[in-house]
Design a protein with these regions (language model features):
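Generic structural signal for helix capping and beta-alpha/helix-loop junctions
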Residues: 32-34, 107, 174
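Pocket-edge structural micro-motifs
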Residues: 3, 26, 77-78, 214
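PAPS-dependent sulfotransferase catalytic core
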Residues: 1-69
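A basic- and aromatic-enriched beta-loop-alpha substructure that forms the phosphate/nucleotide-
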Residues: 45-101
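Aromatic-acidic/polar surface patches that form glycan- and anion
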Residues: 1, 5, 121, 145, ...
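PAPS-dependent sulfotransferase catalytic domain
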Residues: 76-167, 181-192
Length: 231
């Protein structure tokens, strides 16, 4: 699942991890991304120390590692901006691809609370479009999932050829052993959740300096949104 920041990506990972037939992995390219970019993210050194920092080895694990006993579905949550240019896109061909999007004004209005000067490469929209053009796959919008969790998850499962499981609609509060080591910095809200929260329509007011970025994001979002699945 190729996602951007502030798109309910961790809640969607929770939904999949609630299935008894599914194993999940949390942002497997994060260590690679931090080691290459030097981005000063919270817990950076621990992430790099505890993760595989070579993109080829990460992709090999995703495509070749055996399934744990009793598991038949493998779900990887990715932040698409971790997909740096040096990653050979053809290495992704063996995987099924899906995309989680959010209206860029809503995304930026939320993201600016944690990073005041984001740039396009922080958001992953351009990379999402790149991967979608290469491999296709279902597109889901975070607002649609929040408004209609069960119908949207059913539609997503159907698009992926996986049977829907009602267990995806709720989960126990608290951390998981599948959460990345960075979870304590970012996952407080998810740790307190027991399901998808209600959709709250909010005014997407942006600082004037971010209006040009919102406009740059808009064509990428619109291209993906034109293919979004609905119940």
């Amino acid at each position: 699942m190729w996602s951007g920041p502030r798109t309910i990506s961790t809640a969607l990972m929770r939904a999949w991890s609630s299935r008894p037939d599914t194993v999940v992995i949390d942002e497997p390219l994060y260590g690679f991304y931090l080691s290459r970019t030097g981005a000063p993210h919270p817990g950076r050194d621990e992430v790099i120390k505890t993760m595989n920092n070579g993109w080829r080895a990460v992709i090999d694990d995703l495509t070749q590692a055996p399934f744990p006993a009793g598991k038949t579905v493998f779900y990887a949550k990715h932040m698409t901006h971790h997909l740096l240019p040096e990653v050979d896109r053809s290495a992704l061909r063996a995987l099924r691809h899906a995309y989680l999007i959010r209206d860029p004004r809503q995304l930026l209005a939320s993201y600016v609370k944690v990073r005041t000067q984001p740039v396009l490469d922080d958001l992953g929209l351009a990379q999402q479009v790149e991967i979608f053009r290469m491999f296709g796959g279902p597109v889901v919008d975070s607002s649609d999932i929040l408004q209609q969790p069960e119908p949207m998850l059913r539609a997503l499962c159907d698009a992926l050829g996986v049977a829907f499981d009602p267990a995806m609609l709720s989960w126990p509060a608290g951390p998981r052993d599948t959460d990345g080591v960075w979870a304590r910095y970012w996952y407080d809200r998810v740790w307190r959740s027991t399901g998808f929260g209600p959709y709250l329509e909010q005014a997407a007011e942006l600082p004037p300096g971010l209006e040009p970025l919102a406009e740059r994001c808009r064509p990428f979002y619109e291209e993906l949104s034109a293919h979004r699945i609905r119940p």
